[in-house]
Curated annotation (Swiss-Prot):
Gene3D superfamilies: Cation efflux protein transmembrane domain, Cation efflux protein, cytoplasmic domain. Belongs to the cation diffusion facilitator (CDF) transporter (TC 2.A.4) family. NCBIfam families: CDF. The chain crosses the membrane at residues 14-34, 82-102, 115-135, 158-174, 176-196. The gene is ydbO. It comes from Bacillus subtilis (strain 168). Its main location: membrane. It is a multi-pass membrane protein. This is Uncharacterized transporter YdbO. The lineage of its organism: Bacteria, Bacillati, Bacillota, Bacilli, Bacillales. InterPro entries: Cation_efflux, Cation_efflux_CTD, Cation_efflux_CTD_sf, Cation_efflux_TMD_sf, CDF_Transporter. It comes from the Bacteria.
Length: 290
């Protein structure tokens, strides 16, 4: 129940992102086109992909709230990971389009100097998006949402991209018009890099990948439990923002079945309490070490 409430809180951050990105995308695209800034136009297209990514996060958070059923005995938590994967494809497509546009402008030797209005628009956007990043970062940390944290990091990247657009446009005022399309090209690279990072993390999670170093805290917790002789095996996987763990422990072979079951319950309770894990399955075996 607590996890569902946290997912609902996460929707606020996703909705805030959508609202902010819609406004910024429209403003940047209009000003970028009217005042001849390739960098600001690229930044606006970047925000357009962010709208899609934020909508995907919102949809994923809502689907993830559905309870487990006969077809999904572990719940629907992976919906937010799937939505992130879809968003990464769209972001990559737009990033490539920006790269092509910036590359053509560089090759064409553009001499058109953007208006300073484009520079101030980019600077204002950078400050605004960094504020959005700080808000969503705090919210994501409080509700332990990896999807919202990823969205927050994307907002931080957007702030840096907008700052880069400001530098590009401002440099054009110093009789360096080539800096603007070069900045647009760099923005395209940043969009593609962000898309790749999201794709890599989402695909790793969906294929049940789990970094070995992240298992250490769980091993340390089990190691402190008195009646556990050995942690024979431990595996974990992500289902959305939740963690599911399976482990095999050994206990004194003289323990009764009921006592062994009690040790397993103690392990489950400590793992869930100390690490906010959703599901823990513990298999108990008699210790055969003499």
């Amino acid at each position: 129940m607590e996890r569902t409430e946290n997912l609902k809180k996460g929707e606020k951050g996703a909705l805030l992102n959508i609202f902010a990105y819609v406004i910024l995308a429209v403003v940047k695209l209009v000003i970028g086109i009217l005042y001849h800034s390739e960098a600001l136009r690229a930044d606006g297209l970047n925000n357009g992909t962010d709208i899609v990514a934020s909508v995907a996060v919102l949809i994923g958070l809502r689907i993830s709230q559905r309870p487990a059923d006969s077809d999904h005995p572990y719940g629907h938590y992976r919906a937010e990971t799937i939505s992130s994967l879809v968003a990464s494809f769209i972001m990559m497509a737009v990033g490539i389009e920006v790269l092509i546009g910036g590359g053509k402008a560089i090759a064409g030797g553009t001499t058109e100097t953007p208006n300073l209005i484009a520079a101030w628009t980019a600077l204002g956007s950078a400050v605004f998006m960094y504020g959005i990043y700080l808000y969503n970062k705090r919210l994501a940390a409080s509700i332990k949402s990896s999807a919202l944290m990823a969205a927050a990091k994307d907002s931080r990247s957007d702030a840096f991209v907008s700052a880069g657009a400001f530098i590009g446009v401002f440099s054009s005022q110093l009789k360096l018009p080539w800096v603007d399309p070069v900045t647009a090209f760099i923005i395209g690279i940043i969009i593609c890099k962000t898309a790749w990072d999201i794709f890599k993390d989402a695909s790793h999670s969906l294929t049940d990948g789990f970094h070995l170093k992240d298992l250490e805290p769980y091993k340390q917790t089990v190691g402190r439990i008195e009646n556990v002789h050995r942690l024979k095996d431990v595996k974990a996987r992500y289902l959305g923002s939740t963690v599911h763990i399976e482990m095999v422990i050994t206990v004194d072979p003289k323990l009764t079945v009921e006592e062994g079951h009690g040790v397993a319950d103690e392990v489950e309770d400590k793992i869930k309490h100390e690490h906010d894990v959703t599901h823990v399955h513990v298999h108990v075996e008699p210790d055969d070490i003499k």
